[in-house]
A protein has these predicted regions:
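N-terminal presequence-like segments and the immediate start of the first folded domain
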Residues: 2-129
Length: 129
């Protein structure tokens, strides 16, 4: 048996988009794209609208980074109340997801940074060649 090992060549330079003093919204290294935690623009709304807005922000940032949701490798989803909001979040997620391209996904309950935030998502994707 022969084993073949493949390695991604990742350059040492990192491109950062939407940079603040504390973090950036997007970090790109080679063909890897990492998004900071994304939230809804209007956190006074319910889980359905917050999830829609969060996913729209993800779409926008992925496009800006040169990729799209069909190239997402993994998503971490943080819900304020998983028992209450899991089904509604999943309904929006399922409608948004690129058919045939489900990413690796983790969904957990978490105390988020503000009481009105119901969902936050972090994403890792690749840029197509």
């Amino acid at each position: 048996n022969q084993f073949y090992f493949y390695a991604w060549e990742i350059t040492m330079s990192v491109q950062r988009l939407h940079v603040t003093s504390r973090y950036c919204e997007v970090a790109i290294a080679g063909n890897l794209v990492h998004l900071a935690g994304q939230l809804a623009d209007d956190t006074s709304t319910d889980i359905t609208i917050q999830t829609q807005q969060t996913l729209a922000n993800i779409d926008r940032l992925l496009l800006e980074a040169g990729t799209d949701k069909s190239h997402i490798l993994s998503v971490f989803i943080f819900l304020k109340d998983i028992e209450k909001d899991y089904a509604a979040m999943n309904a929006v997620w399922d409608a948004w997801l690129a058919e045939g391209h489900p990413p690796a996904r983790t969904c957990v309950e978490s105390k988020l940074y503000a009481a009105e935030v119901l969902v936050e998502m972090t994403v890792t994707a690749i840029r197509p060649d």
